[in-house]
């Protein structure tokens, strides 16, 4: 049976991950640790014999720079790459820039958990005159006003990620090309929920660690057979737990 592999990588730690702030569509770069995580992901993939024909990422530099570092370690810096806003992180609305722990102290751990992980829960909206509104950013100039979020739930994130998967990424895989996606915690959670047919309760508890390759294997009908992280299992579990704890009051 022919097995097709797909690699997903959440960007390495960003400067705002380090500062425990809601990031969303804000274009913050990788921290030094994040660069190291991205390079380590590339080394792991090289050790396991991976190489790729095409890469996808978002239009946010923490994901783009993660992909650059991964491909550099694979000696595949030349690889064709498609960047799409549809792979962007979930938009956190008026929470963008706020410290997660301080927000939890103000609103409570459970409210912040729902804002971060709830399926259909949207954080408070931005207003269009807010400098954080994506309509002020030239990279989104070709998007319609309807496509520009004031805030997003995971459900709304799924509404943009999954059509991009089915219409753009999956056909390339079906043509025989080997694909890697470097994206974000929530855009990848959206894809994982779809691939694994997870319930809303199950996705609430899913935390994807930064800078760790997640491999999916598909059968000849492109149904997922299994998935697994590359690397030390204890270290990966600790990183996922750290992601879960970011939204708790100190």
UniProtKB/Swiss-Prot annotation:
EC number of this enzyme: 5.4.2.11
Catalysed transformations (reactions)? (2R)-2-phosphoglycerate = (2R)-3-phosphoglycerate
Q: Which GO terms describe its biological process?
A: gluconeogenesis; glycolytic process
* Positions contributing to substrate binding: 10-17, 23-24, 62, 89-92, 100, 116-117, 185-186
Query: Which UniProt keywords are given for this protein, alphabetically ordered?
Result: Gluconeogenesis, Glycolysis, Isomerase
**SMART domains according to UniProt:** PGAM (SM00855)
* InterPro entries tied to this protein: His_Pase_superF_clade-1 (IPR013078), His_PPase_superfam (IPR029033), PG/BPGM_mutase_AS (IPR001345), Phosphogly_mut1 (IPR005952)
- Pfam families annotated for this entry? His_Phos_1 (PF00300)
Q: Which Gene3D superfamilies match?
A: Phosphoglycerate mutase-like (3.40.50.1240)
Task: List the residues marked with site Transition state stabilizer.
Answer: 184
The active site lies at: 11 (tele-phosphohistidine intermediate), 89 (proton donor/acceptor)
Q: In which pathway does it act?
A: Carbohydrate degradation; glycolysis; pyruvate from D-glyceraldehyde 3-phosphate: step 3/5
Asked if the Swiss-Prot or TrEMBL record annotates the protein with the keyword Isomerase, the reply is yes
Molecular function as annotated in GO: phosphoglycerate mutase activity
Q: Which PANTHER family match?
A: PHOSPHOGLYCERATE MUTASE
Function summary: Catalyzes the interconversion of 2-phosphoglycerate and 3-phosphoglycerate.
Q: How does it assemble?
A: Homodimer.
The family note in this entry says: Belongs to the phosphoglycerate mutase family. BPG-dependent PGAM subfamily.
List the protein's name.
2,3-bisphosphoglycerate-dependent phosphoglycerate mutase
Source organism of this protein record: Salmonella paratyphi A (strain AKU_12601)
Upper taxonomic classification of the species? Bacteria, Pseudomonadati, Pseudomonadota, Gammaproteobacteria, Enterobacterales
Gene encoding the protein = gpmA
